[in-house]
């Protein structure tokens, strides 16, 4: 069971906190819903959100780093990569994951993705 043992979810309290949502532009039909959901969650927590758009998921770490170094107290990175018949999916996902993890470790700013 994948949900077994999961913690109960409650809206965190982040009154006045600045959160940057970094979102890729590819697959806008899907991304629109993801961005709207992220903004809703940030708002419910009492934080202030801004949105920065990346060309694609590969570029998310660069913009996440800029947001973290620019004063964001947390970064939410959103991207959609659809698996096809080539290894492109693996390359992009690995680079984005490694890069976003590196941003969090290097800056001390939480990066959710």
Give the positions of each predicted feature.
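Short gly/ser/thr-rich secondary-structure transition/capping motifs
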Residues: 1-6
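Glycine-rich phosphate/diphosphate-binding loop of Rossmann-like nucleotide-binding domains
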Residues: 10-54
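C-terminal binding/interaction regions
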Residues: 22, 94-113
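Alpha-helical macromolecular-interaction surfaces
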Residues: 33, 37-40, 62, 70, ...
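N-terminal small/polar loop signature for handling phosphorylated ligands or for N-terminal nucleophile
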Residues: 52-77, 83, 87, 101-105
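Serine-dependent acyl-ester chemistry module
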Residues: 90
């Amino acid at each position: 069971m994948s949900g077994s043992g999961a913690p109960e979810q409650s809206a965190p309290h982040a009154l006045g906190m600045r959160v940057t949502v970094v979102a890729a532009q590819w697959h806008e039909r899907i991304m629109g819903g993801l961005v709207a959901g992220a903004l809703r969650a940030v708002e419910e927590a009492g934080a202030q959100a801004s949105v920065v758009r990346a060309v694609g998921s590969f570029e998310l770490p660069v913009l996440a780093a800029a947001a973290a170094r620019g004063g964001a107290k947390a970064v939410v990175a959103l991207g959609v990569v659809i698996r096809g018949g080539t290894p492109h999916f693996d390359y992009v996902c690995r680079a984005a994951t490694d890069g976003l993890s590196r941003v969090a470790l290097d800056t001390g700013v939480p990066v959710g993705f």
